[in-house]
């Protein structure tokens, strides 16, 4: 699987993900890009789960963002509704984190659209490790990028499905 973490702190929103792609117990690739900018570059998205399924969902989210420009929450809710009710989409096995300048969200196949309480959110096989590390570091003087990078490093030290090849995307956040 993988680990994706997002941090909203100090006027920045940062999303970081590792690069490992596993097939069963085998590492197939170590430098995949699971965090990227979508839409007009004003939204960052990261995914965990089946890669083909995640790309399908990213494409759907981009279409929703075209339909609802500048409204990430609305686009995410509409995607989650489709994901939950569509017979084809319902079978997709992936999770997504998305963020823009004003909101960070987790979108799940159960139709959940979740906003973090404390400025940190993480998904994937190492998500719980990364989230715990990030929460512990949020009250320090570390920048959002430093918190994300360290949280992902800790997750990679613990989770065998997460590596240290980190991709980071950053946006300016609203105060």
From Swiss-Prot:
Claim: tRNA processing is one of the keywords in the record: no
Location(s) in or outside the cell: Cytoplasm
Keyword Isomerase appears in the UniProt entry: no
E.C. number(s) listed in UniProt: 3.4.25.2
GO CC list: HslUV protease complex; proteasome core complex
Any GO BP: proteolysis involved in protein catabolic process
Active site: 2
Predominant localisation class: cytoplasm
Classification via Gene3D superfamilies: Glutamine Phosphoribosylpyrophosphate, subunit 1, domain 1 (3.60.20.10)
Source organism superkingdom: Bacteria
UniProt-listed Pfam families: Proteasome (PF00227)
Catalytic reaction list: ATP-dependent cleavage of peptide bonds with broad specificity
Binding, Na(+): 156, 159, 162
Matching SUPFAM superfamilies: N-terminal nucleophile aminohydrolases (Ntn hydrolases)
One of the record's GO molecular function terms: threonine-type endopeptidase activity
Regulation: Allosterically activated by HslU binding.
InterPro entries recorded: ATP-dep_Prtase_HsIV_su, Ntn_hydrolases_N, Proteasome_sua/b, Proteasome_suB-type
Keywords: Allosteric enzyme, Cytoplasm, Hydrolase, Metal-binding, Protease, Sodium, Stress response, Threonine protease
PROSITE patterns in UniProt: PROTEASOME_BETA_2
Entry similarity comment: Belongs to the peptidase T1B family. HslV subfamily.
Function: Protease subunit of a proteasome-like degradation complex believed to be a general protein degrading machinery.
Alphabetized HAMAP family for the sequence: HslV
Subunit structure: A double ring-shaped homohexamer of HslV is capped on each side by a ring-shaped HslU homohexamer. The assembly of the HslU/HslV complex is dependent on binding of ATP.
PANTHER family, sorted: ATP-DEPENDENT PROTEASE SUBUNIT HSLV (PTHR32194:SF7), METALLOPROTEASE TLDD (PTHR32194)
Protein name as catalogued: ATP-dependent protease subunit HslV
Source organism: Rhizobium rhizogenes (strain K84 / ATCC BAA-868) (Agrobacterium radiobacter)
């Amino acid at each position: 699987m993988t680990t994706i973490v997002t941090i909203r702190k100090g006027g920045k929103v940062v999303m970081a993900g590792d690069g490992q792609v596993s097939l069963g117990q085998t590492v197939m690739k170590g430098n995949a890009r699971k965090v990227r900018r979508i839409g007009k570059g004003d939204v960052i998205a990261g995914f965990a789960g089946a890669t083909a399924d995640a790309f399908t969902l990213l494409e759907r989210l981009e279409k929703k963002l075209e339909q609802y420009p500048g409204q990430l929450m609305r686009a995410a809710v509409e995607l989650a509704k489709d994901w939950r009710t569509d017979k084809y989409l319902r079978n997709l096995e992936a999770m997504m984190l998305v963020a823009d300048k004003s909101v960070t969200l987790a979108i799940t196949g159960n139709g959940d659209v979740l906003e973090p309480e404390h400025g940190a959110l993480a998904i994937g096989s190492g998500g719980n490790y990364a989230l715990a590390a990030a929460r512990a570091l949020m009250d320090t003087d570390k920048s959002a990028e430093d918190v994300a990078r360290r949280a992902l490093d800790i997750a990679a030290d613990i989770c065998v499905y997460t590596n240290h090849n980190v991709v980071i995307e950053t946006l300016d956040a609203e105060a």
